Amino acid sequence: MTAITRITLTGALLAAALLLAALQPARAETLDRIVAVVDDQVVLASELERELATIANQLRSRGQRLPPRDVFQRQVLERLITQRVQLSRAQRVGITVDDATLDAAMQRMARQNNMTLGQFRQAVEQEGFEYNYFREGIREEIAISRLRQAQVEEQVTVTPQEVEEVLETLDDENQEYRLGHILVATPEAASTAQLEEARERIEQLREQIIAGETDFEGAATAFSDAASAMEGGDLGWRLHSQLPSLFAEAIDEGLQAGEVSGVLQNSSGFHLVKLMDQRTQGGERVTETRARHILIRTDGDVITDEDARLRLRSLLERIEAGESFAELAEAYSEDPGSAARGGDLGWTQPGQLVPEFQGAMDALEEGQISAPFASPFGWHIVQVTDRRERDVSRERLRDQLAQQIHQRKVEEAFEQWIRRLRDEAYVDVRVEL
């Protein structure tokens, strides 16, 4: 068993240079006696001394004072016992790390430190460690990482509601809203008949907008009594605090981008507002593209590159002659994911597609179809069907919050899990602390 510095194998493997700087050889004169038994595993005195020296060096390098010897030794021994408890559980549930996986991990550690594997091995040995001993320590850490992932991380879920609750607690003053506005004004001392007539007018306008008989901007220009009528009702971008309270309430009640509010009333008359867009102040806007494609795969033998290109050229000519792109994609495209949707790839953001496809698509205007081109998947023709600018700041904030909530819940679950493992394990400490 090994007692090398703990290594976390989530994301990239740790920078081995830092690890090697902390590692120091065990004292040669340490007697190898058992200091603790954990299930069917043992912790040796030499391992405890090695871990004490390693952690002491780390603390000193950070300018921290060491705790009293008895406290320090108790903390480090408990750390080793916790490691053994996890290794014992990993063995019981059948978690193993084969040599191929271990070899790949060692190669990654070497690459991350700009070394060949031979140079990395030499660096480990120069620090006084036998390389195979170091290697087996990495094997143990991979096993522990897999155990934690299976029994803790994968059991933790984050619901959309949890994320939304956190979002609601955040200060929304950095949110900007672009509203469209229609006003049917009423006199200051309007009669009941005047109020009813105004309400009926705006309700009819709303019904026509919802039914698609007119668009909001056109209705605002033609019928709104507000100062923004000539701008199609566009109020421009405003912070939440800059919105009239009546409009802010509509936002707070859940009005979504593209939606038209119900009829709102105040002393000025009756209002409709449309949330045209929303963004985070100073946020990140991207151009999203909606496209559809037809893919012909090649195998180098039966279907060559030239065969695929000619087949796509023929399909392109049929589309230009008036046949439906969607129907031809459904019939001939060899991309099963999109063929059933007429080749539609949905909305994509820059960087989501392979560079060859992204470049061909970005060069097109809306409605334009590309010439046949190759990608790692085969040969394509692509048509851009729509483009839009969209603020993705809130989406990315939502993703970040989900990750943060997940990490917090994992940490809480891990503490409970490790305590349970410790309580369930047989532990016999054979040294006075």
UniProtKB/Swiss-Prot annotation:
Domain annotation PpiC: ranges: 174-277, 286-386
Protein name: Chaperone SurA
Coiled-coil region(s): none
Organism of provenance: Alkalilimnicola ehrlichii (strain ATCC BAA-1101 / DSM 17681 / MLHE-1)
Record field: catalytic activity: [protein]-peptidylproline (omega=180) = [protein]-peptidylproline (omega=0)
Free-text comment on this protein's domains from its UniProt entry: The PPIase activity resides only in the second parvulin domain. The N-terminal region and the C-terminal tail are necessary and sufficient for the chaperone activity of SurA. The PPIase activity is dispensable for SurA to function as a chaperone. The N-terminal region and the C-terminal tail are also required for porin recognition.
Entry's localization field: Periplasm
Signal peptide annotation: 1-28
Role this protein plays: Chaperone involved in the correct folding and assembly of outer membrane proteins. Recognizes specific patterns of aromatic residues and the orientation of their side chains, which are found more frequently in integral outer membrane proteins. May act in both early periplasmic and late outer membrane-associated steps of protein maturation.
Keyword vocabulary terms for this entry: Chaperone, Isomerase, Periplasm, Repeat, Rotamase, Signal
Enzyme class: isomerase
Classification via PANTHER family: CHAPERONE SURA
UniProt main location, coarse: periplasm
GO CC annotations, alphabetized: outer membrane-bounded periplasmic space
Source lineage: Bacteria, Pseudomonadati, Pseudomonadota, Gammaproteobacteria, Chromatiales
Alphabetized GO MF terms: peptide binding; peptidyl-prolyl cis-trans isomerase activity; unfolded protein binding
EC number: 5.2.1.8
One GO biological process term: protein stabilization
